[in-house]
């Protein structure tokens, strides 16, 4: 089982590096995530067309970010998390305020993934 996980992580890292060569390592994975964007004008969450596997990653400059390999189209999502205060856990959503002040909501199918990923993000950014 452990050999299987090592192989799966190696294959996943190869796929991510194909799209984003600067990725150095995978920190954690969640199997299914849907992405929402907060619309300031209407004060509502809008579901985007991006959903798929979530990879918490570290790049060559030791920045923490995430990639969502989109199952619906070739448009993936790759964002960095610059500061622990930019990430919050609200209900079943991981809320991320991006560098350009957009607000992204990530809904994870498994609630255990949500809290685990949130804690790892906070811990990684505080190092």
Swiss-Prot record:
Subunit structure as annotated in this protein's UniProt entry: Component of the decapping complex composed of dcp1 and dcp2.
Known function: Component of the decapping complex necessary for the degradation of mRNAs, both in normal mRNA turnover and in nonsense-mediated mRNA decay. Removes the 7-methyl guanine cap structure from mRNA molecules, yielding a 5'-phosphorylated mRNA fragment and 7m-GDP. Decapping is the major pathway of mRNA degradation in yeast. It occurs through deadenylation, decapping and subsequent 5' to 3' exonucleolytic decay of the transcript body.
Biological processes, Gene Ontology terms: deadenylation-dependent decapping of nuclear-transcribed mRNA; mRNA methylguanosine-cap decapping; mRNA processing; nuclear-transcribed mRNA catabolic process; nuclear-transcribed mRNA catabolic process, nonsense-mediated decay
GO terms of molecular function: mRNA phosphatase activator activity; RNA binding
InterPro entries referenced in this protein's UniProt entry, alphabetically: Dcp1 (IPR010334), PH-like_dom_sf (IPR011993)
Predominant localisation class: cytoplasm
Native source species: Schizosaccharomyces pombe (strain 972 / ATCC 24843)
Family: Belongs to the DCP1 family.
Subcellular location: Cytoplasm; Nucleus
An example Gene Ontology CC term for this record: nucleus
Entry keyword set: Cytoplasm, mRNA processing, Nonsense-mediated mRNA decay, Nucleus, RNA-binding
Protein name: mRNA-decapping enzyme subunit 1
């Amino acid at each position: 089982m452990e050999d299987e996980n090592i192989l799966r992580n190696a294959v996943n890292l190869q796929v991510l590096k194909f799209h984003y060569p600067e990725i150095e390592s995978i920190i954690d994975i969640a199997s299914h995530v849907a992405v929402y964007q907060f619309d300031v004008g209407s004060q509502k969450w809008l579901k985007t067309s991006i959903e798929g596997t979530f990879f918490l990653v570290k790049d060559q400059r030791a920045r923490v970010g995430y990639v969502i390999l989109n199952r619906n189209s070739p448009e993936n999502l790759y964002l960095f998390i610059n500061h622990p205060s930019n990430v919050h856990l609200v209900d079943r959503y991981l809320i991320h305020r991006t560098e350009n002040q957009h607000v992204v909501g990530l809904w994870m199918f498994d609630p255990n993934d949500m809290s685990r990923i949130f804690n790892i993000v906070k811990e990684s950014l505080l190092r």
